[in-house]
Structure formats: C-alpha cells, structure tokens
Amino acid sequence: MVNLEPMHTEIKMSGDVADSTDTRSTFGQVEPGNDRNGLDFNRQIKTEDLGDSLQQTLSHRPCHLSQGPTMMPGNQMSGDMASLHPLQQLVLVPGHLQSVSQFLLSQTPPGQQGLQPNLLSFPQQQSTLLLPQTGPGLASQAVGRPGLSGSSLEPHLDAPQHLPGPKHLPGPGGNDEPTDLEELEKFAKTFKQRRIKLGFTQGDVGLAMGKLYGNDFSQTTISRFEALNLSFKNMCKLKPLLEKWLNDAESSPSDPSASTPSSYPTLSEVFGRKRKKRTSIETNIRLTLEKRFQDNPKPSSEEISMIAEQLSMEKEVVRVWFCNRRQKEKRINCPVATPVKPPIYNSRLVSPSGSLGPLSVPPVHSTMPGTVTSSCSPGNNSRPSSPGSGLHASSPTASQNNSKAAMNSSSSSSFNSSGSWYRWNHPTYLH
C-alpha cells in the first residue's frame, strides 16, 4: 500500500489558483529526477472542485492500481513499453504508475463515482490475479495521449476486472437433453418391438389411444414416432401416452382381474381388432396336405376335422390352407384350361358380310375367274359364279346390279365394287 498522506493535505485545498500551484509542487516532489515528465503532467492537470467524494476516490483507487507494478519488475515493463508511442514513455518505473494513478483519479468526474462500490465488491485475490497479466496494457491505455481526458480512460481501467467472468453459464438442463434423446430412442425401439409382438398395427395404436385417453393419433404419427421423425417436444408429449397404452395392452390379456371394470370394456373393443399372426406350416405337414389336396381338392367339413386331428393342427388353419391352395391351382391352370380364341382378323375372312380388304383377296388374274366372282361384295348376289361366265360383264343382269357403283359404262363396270386396287391390277385396265 502506498502512503498518500502528503498528497491528501495538498489536495484538500479549495479549487483556486493557489491549489493548482501546490499540486504542481507536490508532483515535483514525487518526481525530482524527471523534470520533463513533471512538465507533461502539469500540462494535463485541470483544476476542479474536489469534494468529500473525491477524497473517497483517492482513498480507494490506488489500492487497485498499485498492485500491478508490485507483480512486475520495472525492467520488464520498460521492455514492453519500448515499442509504444514516444508519448507513452512516462510510465517506465513503478514509482511513475503511482503518479499516473493519482492524476487519473484526480480527473474523475462526479458522475462516475457510483462505480466505486462495484470495484470494492470484487475480492482482493481476483484483482491480484488480473493486474499482473494486464499490467502493460493497462499502463499503455492509461497514458495513451496527452489530449485524452480522464473520463475516457476510466473504462479501460475497469474493463480487465470484468473480462474473466463467464459469459454463458451451462444450464442445469444442458446435460439432460442428450440423456432424454437416448431414452426416447430406446423407448421408440422397444415400443415398436413390443407392439409387433402383441400383434397391433400402428393404426390400431392410434385408434386405441383415441378411445382410451381422448387423444386421436393417426397411423402416420405413430410411424413417425417409431422412426424418430417427430420434433423433440412432440415426442416428449407422446411418450407417456404410448408408455401408458403399452402397459395397459400388456397387462390386459395376462391379468384381467387387476383392471378396473370401467376401463377395460373399451380395451376389449380395441383388442378385438387384434391382427392375427401369420401361420407358418412345417415342410412335412405341407407335403402331407399337398397329398391330401391331390386326392380331394375340396374336402368336406368332417374330412377337414379328421385331417386337423391327424396333423395336430387347428381346423380353421386346415380349412384356410385348402381354400388358398384351390385359389393357387386356379391361377396355375387358368391359361391352359380355357380354349384359345381365334384372332379377330380370322372372323372377317369367314364373315359373308365383311368388306374386301387388301389382305383378304389376292390379286386376280384371268386364270382364276371363279375366285373373283365368288368373293365379291354382297350387292352382287345375282352374279353368276360359273367360270364360263368370264371376267367381262356381258350379261344384262350383271350390268344392272353394278349400275349404282359404276363409274362409267365400260366393260369393267361390274368390278367397280371391288375397289380401286382391282382396276389397277386388272390386265384390261388402261394405264
């Protein structure tokens, strides 16, 4: 602790010109070997009216600021300060820091005196740990430039005391969230396994929860819960309901006496939709049933009962197996049993009323007169079909029947109904 009693007697004077001269003489006594530094400090001193509150400031502040030089030797501070601005060469010896602190404290405005209780509230060990680390920086900020006022330098002196405080304290529930996520993941897996073991679908669970607890959930919601595809908040809300339903579902068939009569009538309705498990039949039993099916594909009820007793199976299982086997036999034998229908284009060739197409009649030559006359359109019913009639329509009956469809009264008018392809292919057509 630095003894400041000589300076107290000098600063308790009133704020006139005589006080300023006495203060200058005081600084001159503290620093007899540094006249230049004393002159620089005399230029920065401003005379102000110092009251009782300033005396309290002088009595408290030096104890915080004077601890920095005690922790750091003077040669280390001078080495750190050598690279700074030439105006910062004032603080080179521990004795200079005291004068600087006195100068800064003398410039403290009355508005910043409310910060003193906060500085006193910090323990002495904390300030001892902070000031050795921030000593050079604190000194360089305090004596930055001669033009800076004391009020602008005060926040730099107070800031290092607040830096080591933790900005974000870990909340008490920060470590619980991963645990909750792990618990939710485990519960979702166990819930899915137990639900399948009980034989319930996801839709059954949603309907059961709607009937029992009044909260309707869809099959999609249950599926997303099992897949961990819901938000953390919704999964936390859904977990106790699903856990309660699972406990009720497991305790209902095994211990019906433990349930209340008001709750489990609804449970029995829900459990009535319980899905049946898929029946797996062993290989030797399946071979025996195949032999019985080859002998009698449709056994009677008595025969089904007898087969079930022989194979130690349920009658309903044997009956369902025979039904499924008959359906399988129908699917296998269906294409072979039905007759093959003729193609559609064959019926056009056989039909007497069908029109002639390019594929139905081959090109007609003079050597095949019978084919042309017998396969003409139905409008030529009275046409003679004998080969001796010839290709040319010389008889009057043939010309009368073809008068509507004739384009001209030429010798080939009887074949106009056969289409343009016949006129082009006929040897008598003039190209």
UniProtKB/Swiss-Prot annotation:
Example of a GO cellular component annotation carried by this entry: plasma membrane
DNA-binding region in chain numbering: 274-333
One family name in Pfam for this protein: Pou
SMART domains registered for this protein in UniProt: HOX, POU
Sequence ranges of Low complexity compositional bias: 251-267, 352-364, 374-390, 398-419
Residue stretches spanning the membrane: none
Disruption of the gene: reported phenotype: Mice homozygous for null mutation exhibit defective keratinocyte differentiation, however the skin and coat appear normal.
Stretches of the chain forming a coiled coil according to its record: none
Expression tissues: Skin, thymus, stomach and testis.
GO MF assignments: DNA binding; DNA-binding transcription activator activity, RNA polymerase II-specific; identical protein binding; RNA polymerase II cis-regulatory region sequence-specific DNA binding; sequence-specific DNA binding
DNA-binding is among the record's keywords: yes
Family in the record: Belongs to the POU transcription factor family. Class-2 subfamily.
Function: Transcription factor that binds to the octamer motif (5'-ATTTGCAT-3'). Regulates cell type-specific differentiation pathways. Involved in the regulation of keratinocytes differentiation. The POU2F3-POU2AF2/POU2AF3 complex drives the expression of tuft-cell-specific genes, a rare chemosensory cells that coordinate immune and neural functions within mucosal epithelial tissues.
Record's subunit section: Interacts (via the POU domain) with POU2AF1 and POU2AF2 in a DNA-dependent manner; this interaction recruits POU2AF2 to chromatin and increases POU2F3 transactivation activity.
Name this protein carries in UniProt: POU domain, class 2, transcription factor 3
Organism of origin: Mus musculus (Mouse)
Underlying gene: Pou2f3
